[in-house]
């Protein structure tokens, strides 16, 4: 196999541009709220800038680490991440917000282990699929063990009230298994078996039912369950084609909840308009398309599965976030990669891009 020197510069550029633009949008979306809550309009800007710096350093390190090293660390990282997920439940260590226990409290920083768990899952599956790909046509020795492991992780995430992360991990794993050659009937059969459980989880939790009803008809409860999506629509509608101008949005002025986190695209749409949203969506599409090309041209199965999993993760999270913001899906609590405020998501996303970039230096041909 011929080795191609040099990183995929388009992947690198998209990650850097999206992150830098995200820092700007975090400031625009949060400055007024930060000034009122923390008496410092630059509070979230300074923190997000620090997260971006750490993320860029992590990406730079990952770019220069031979991705084959992750084979040795795939299982320890996977098990270690599971331990971190359990630490969330330990009093004094785990942090709770809005009824969800998802964070580990660190000095000056709350770490969300589910973000690391997504990448750890991809690394473990890439390692395992390379070794066991010939067994995937069999149910008990091939497909079922992955579902068993996934079931344990998903149970822990659901106990943390983090259905968004649980569904994301499940979707990424299923796509990776399908790409590796798992029979479609196994996947469809698992879906039919899991359907009653999913319905039970939704219909037995009042807050999840409110999300579903708000998704179907937000105007039925415009001041509570439907409030967030209605304010998001108002922001996007007000932005029109060209937007109100950077920093000129009104919905971020205590109307739109989570304006600098999960719904930052709404602020972007109001200030940069339809054009701005299309540009951001196009950048994500280009990032995912180039990442998949890196996966296809990878020199071995481990690199192929690793790059493909990262591409699917970033693309899926971006798609789901945009779908939620525009009302095409119920709210899930999934951040927009590179743009939403949050250290765990940004740092892990940039580091995963660094791993993917290292894969791009060892390909069978130019991507």
From Swiss-Prot:
Residues passing through the membrane, by range: 9-29, 50-70, 73-93, 139-159, 162-182, 184-204, 226-246, 267-287, 305-325, 336-356
Annotated InterPro entries: Cell_cycle_FtsW-rel_CS (IPR018365), FtsW (IPR013437), FtsW/RodA (IPR001182)
GO annotation, biological process: cell division; cell wall organization; peptidoglycan biosynthetic process; regulation of cell shape
Periplasmic side: 30-49, 94-138, 183, 247-266, 326-335
Similarity comment: Belongs to the SEDS family. FtsW subfamily.
Membrane topology listed for this record: Multi-pass membrane protein
GO cellular component, one term: plasma membrane
Catalyzed chemical reaction(s): [GlcNAc-(1->4)-Mur2Ac(oyl-L-Ala-gamma-D-Glu-L-Lys-D-Ala-D-Ala)](n)-di-trans,octa-cis-undecaprenyl diphosphate + beta-D-GlcNAc-(1->4)-Mur2Ac(oyl-L-Ala-gamma-D-Glu-L-Lys-D-Ala-D-Ala)-di-trans,octa-cis-undecaprenyl diphosphate = [GlcNAc-(1->4)-Mur2Ac(oyl-L-Ala-gamma-D-Glu-L-Lys-D-Ala-D-Ala)](n+1)-di-trans,octa-cis-undecaprenyl diphosphate + di-trans,octa-cis-undecaprenyl diphosphate + H(+)
Cytoplasmic side: 1-8, 71-72, 160-161, 205-225, 288-304, 357-367
Top-level class of the enzyme under EC nomenclature: transferase
Record localization: Cell inner membrane
Species in which this protein is naturally found: Geobacter sp. (strain M18)
Function text: Peptidoglycan polymerase that is essential for cell division.
Name this polypeptide is given: Probable peptidoglycan glycosyltransferase FtsW
GO MF assignments: lipid-linked peptidoglycan transporter activity; peptidoglycan glycosyltransferase activity
């Amino acid at each position: 196999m011929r080795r191609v020197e040099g990183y995929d510069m388009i992947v690198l550029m998209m990650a850097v541009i999206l992150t830098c633009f995200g820092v700007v949008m975090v400031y625009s979306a949060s400055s007024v709220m930060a000034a009122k809550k923390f008496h410092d309009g630059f509070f979230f800007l300074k923190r997000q800038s620090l997260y971006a710096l750490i993320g860029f350093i992590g990406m730079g390190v990952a770019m220069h680490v031979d991705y084959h090293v992750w084979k040795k660390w795939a299982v320890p990282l996977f098990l270690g991440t599971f331990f971190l997920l359990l630490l969330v439940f330990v009093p004094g260590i785990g942090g709770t917000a809005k009824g969800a226990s998802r964070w580990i409290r660190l000095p000056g920083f709350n770490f969300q282990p589910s973000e690391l768990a997504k990448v750890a899952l991809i690394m473990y599956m890439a390692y395992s699929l390379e070794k066991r790909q010939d067994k995937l046509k069999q149910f008990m020795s091939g497909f079922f063990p992955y579902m068993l492991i996934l079931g344990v992780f998903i149970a822990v995430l659901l106990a943390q009230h983090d259905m968004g992360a649980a569904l994301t991990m499940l979707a990424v794993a299923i796509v990776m298994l399908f790409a590796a050659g798992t029979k479609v009937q196994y996947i469809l059969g698992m879906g039919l078996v899991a359907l009653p459980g999913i319905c039970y989880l939704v219909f037995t939790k009042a807050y999840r039912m409110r999300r579903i009803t708000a998704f179907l008809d937000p105007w039925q409860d415009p001041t509570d369950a439907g409030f967030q999506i209605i304010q998001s629509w108002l922001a996007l509608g007000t932005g029109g084609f060209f937007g109100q101008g950077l920093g000129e949005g009104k919905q971020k002025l205590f109307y739109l909840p989570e304006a600098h986190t999960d719904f930052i695209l709404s602020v972007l749409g109001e200030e940069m308009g339809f054009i701005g949203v299309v540009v951001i969506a196009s950048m994500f599409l280009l990032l995912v398309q180039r990442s998949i090309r890196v996966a296809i041209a990878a020199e071995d199965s481990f690199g192929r599965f690793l790059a493909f999993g990262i591409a699917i993760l970033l693309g899926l999270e971006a798609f789901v976030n945009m779908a939620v913001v525009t009302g095409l899906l119920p709210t899930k609590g999934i951040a927009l990669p590179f743009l939403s405020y949050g250290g765990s998501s940004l740092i892990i996303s940039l580091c995963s891009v660094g791993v993917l970039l290292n894969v791009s230096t060892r390909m069978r041909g130019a991507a």
